[in-house]
Amino acid sequence: MNSLSYLNHDQQGFPPPEQALSDPNGLLAVGGDLRPERLLNAYYNGIFPWFNLDDPILWWSPDPRAVFVPGNMKISRSLVKYLKKQDWTYTINHNFEAVTAGCAEPRAGQDGTWISSEIQQAYLSLHQQGYAHSLEVWQDKQLIGGLYGLAIGQVFCGESMFHRATNASKAAMIVLQQHLQRCGFKLIDAQVVNPHLDSLGAKSIKRDDFLRLLTHLRDGEVSIDSWSKAEVSIEL
């Protein structure tokens, strides 16, 4: 029977993901901190943080895992028709802080999100070090949607997305997976299966299979200019 591990400030390592609890699904460890070194170690080993504002830091590796293969995203005809009517522009790494702030905005019917100022600062540090990246959706120079995550070799680990206009986050996801495919990425880690991701074509795979893929891809090479500041296009 698996038991929960408790991390101290000096302990950078994690227990094997296979030791995660089944209830709640994927909970692996408690504690530690959000220093860049620990976060990178977590993602490199298929682990990610998620916790409510008043909780200690919780670390997860759920089974099954939600993933996309870049280029295989499901785009409905109605969504294509809608997006073709929009005069939106898309950029890479133009305003990481604004994207994380947007992701931290409460959703309808919620009082807040788990993305605290501490979380935003932690991922900003990773962005400044070249590991975390954002994709922005603009309308008339106003930020209307976006997403952010980490690049680990040929794997992009998606963290969060937001929208202030209908379908803007879906557009961001479409542009992201097209961009990743062009740059040589092989997998998008979407963490936990949910109806929204399922509607976009996310696949649910066993944790063991995900970890094998991650081990194979996490040191792979991608295009050197994958994350240069740039405007990118959407292909519909």
Curated annotation (Swiss-Prot):
Record-linked SUPFAM superfamilies: Acyl-CoA N-acyltransferases (Nat) (SSF55729)
Free-text function comment from the UniProt entry: Functions in the N-end rule pathway of protein degradation where it conjugates Leu, Phe and, less efficiently, Met from aminoacyl-tRNAs to the N-termini of proteins containing an N-terminal arginine or lysine.
Cross-referenced InterPro entries: Acyl_CoA_acyltransferase, Leu/Phe-tRNA_Trfase, Leu/Phe-tRNA_Trfase_C, Leu/Phe-tRNA_Trfase_N
Protein name: Leucyl/phenylalanyl-tRNA--protein transferase
Gene this chain is encoded by: aat
Keyword Ribonucleoprotein included in the entry's annotation: no
GO CC terms, sorted: cytoplasm
Coiled-coil portions: none
Entry keyword set: Acyltransferase, Cytoplasm, Transferase
Listed GO biological process terms: protein catabolic process
Family: Belongs to the L/F-transferase family.
Reaction(s) this enzyme catalyzes, per UniProt: N-terminal L-lysyl-[protein] + L-leucyl-tRNA(Leu) = N-terminal L-leucyl-L-lysyl-[protein] + tRNA(Leu) + H(+); N-terminal L-arginyl-[protein] + L-leucyl-tRNA(Leu) = N-terminal L-leucyl-L-arginyl-[protein] + tRNA(Leu) + H(+); L-phenylalanyl-tRNA(Phe) + an N-terminal L-alpha-aminoacyl-[protein] = an N-terminal L-phenylalanyl-L-alpha-aminoacyl-[protein] + tRNA(Phe)
EC annotation from Swiss-Prot or TrEMBL: 2.3.2.6
One Pfam family, short name: Leu_Phe_trans
Gene Ontology MF terms: leucyl-tRNA--protein transferase activity
Subcellular location: Cytoplasm
